[in-house]
Amino acid sequence: MKTPTLGQLATENGAQVVGDPDLAVVGLAPLDQAGPGDLSFLSNPLYLPQALASAAGAVIVSPADLERIRADGQAEGRNWLVARNPYVCFARVAQRFDRAANADSRTGIDPRASVAPDAVVPASCFIGPNVVIESGARLGERVRILANAFIGASAEIGEDTLIYANVSVYHRCVIGARNILHSGAVIGADGFGFAPDIGPTGVEYVKIPQVGRAVLGNDVEIGANTAVDRGAMADTVIEDGCKIDNQVQIAHNVHVGAHTVIAGTAAVSGSTKIGRFCVIGGAANFSGHLNIADRTTVSGGTSITKSITKPGGHYTSVFPFTSHGEWERNAAIVRGLSKLRERVVQLERRQRGENNAPAQNKQDEEKSS
């Protein structure tokens, strides 16, 4: 790829150059590591001193930050790429460089792969060594499936999707266009469905066949070792644009709305519906059969046990960390809260002169709770 100029990058990303539009941009780097040929970015005004001290050939900034730099008299003699959202601009420029560095023009089927005779594999696809594609599977144009991946019977893979090594896509599952499935991801394994049969000697669990599918929309990314289970009867659905991190558990019949992001080790129990544009922190967990409103933010480690109906809320259930000794003292206080409440109720009764009014006890407790 020919080295792009700052002016070309501005045109591609709807940005404006202040400085030399002919500057050749050879790479991207953080502010403190960038050199004269590198492009860096400033997305937080707190790092303005680092931007001014950087040796970067150019820095992506917002219009407001450029005005601050000009007010300090330090804009002249440097190159700035002015974008409405510097972080997004940086991401798109990074995609450009990543495509060039990792361009994979390979096509065809590796002789060590096993592809069913009736599977549909366009000539533009690349199928790596030891890949297994079962009967009836259908691939779109330019799909790339790397070593040791498994595509089950009658599965569908959309165009321009990249499936890394050791991914498993079970039978009849649907993967949309431009998806990225990272190594170890499992799409469409059986959901955790069992019917308890209580007998005289105990409980036996009878397996419920999971006959639904896992269906992923377009532009979805699934992290390493993440599991998206197939539905029990209806489908498990991940809508367009969702980004799911590593080691996340999506249980059967879950529905995740478009452009929701879920960080690592989160777990969503069966039949829960998460809305659009939600942000789910790492290690958050959801009980089953809940409805989560659009644009909900859930902090890392939070346990959601009830539905959230109001859009745009931010929810947290984890105490910030403290020293171990302080945590132990706080834990002791929490353990004593029920006794403390009883004492408060008694003191309130005394204050109102109600010590000898047992008929009011229940009402008093309800008012205090």
Swiss-Prot record:
Highest classification ranks of the organism:
Bacteria, Pseudomonadati, Pseudomonadota, Betaproteobacteria, Burkholderiales
**One term of GO molecular function:** N-acyltransferase activity
Supply the InterPro entries for this chain.
Hexapep, Hexapep_transf_CS, LpxD, Trimer_LpxA-like_sf, UDP_GlcNAc_AcTrfase_non-rep
Reactions mediated catalytically = a UDP-3-O-[(3R)-3-hydroxyacyl]-alpha-D-glucosamine + a (3R)-hydroxyacyl-[ACP] = a UDP-2-N,3-O-bis[(3R)-3-hydroxyacyl]-alpha-D-glucosamine + holo-[ACP] + H(+)
Write out the pathway annotation from the protein's UniProt entry: Bacterial outer membrane biogenesis; LPS lipid A biosynthesis
Protein's name in the database: UDP-3-O-acylglucosamine N-acyltransferase
Q: Name its species.
A: Cupriavidus metallidurans (strain ATCC 43123 / DSM 2839 / NBRC 102507 / CH34)
Q: Matching Pfam families, A to Z?
A: Hexapep, LpxD
Q: Which family does it belong to?
A: Belongs to the transferase hexapeptide repeat family. LpxD subfamily.
What keywords appear on the UniProt entry? Acyltransferase, Lipid A biosynthesis, Lipid biosynthesis, Lipid metabolism, Repeat, Transferase
Ranges where the record places region Disordered: 348-369
Provide the Gene Ontology terms for cellular component. Answer: membrane
Biological role: Catalyzes the N-acylation of UDP-3-O-acylglucosamine using 3-hydroxyacyl-ACP as the acyl donor. Is involved in the biosynthesis of lipid A, a phosphorylated glycolipid that anchors the lipopolysaccharide to the outer membrane of the cell.
Indicate the residues that form the catalytic site: H252 (proton acceptor)
Q: How does it assemble?
A: Homotrimer.
* Alphabetized PROSITE patterns for the sequence: HEXAPEP_TRANSFERASES
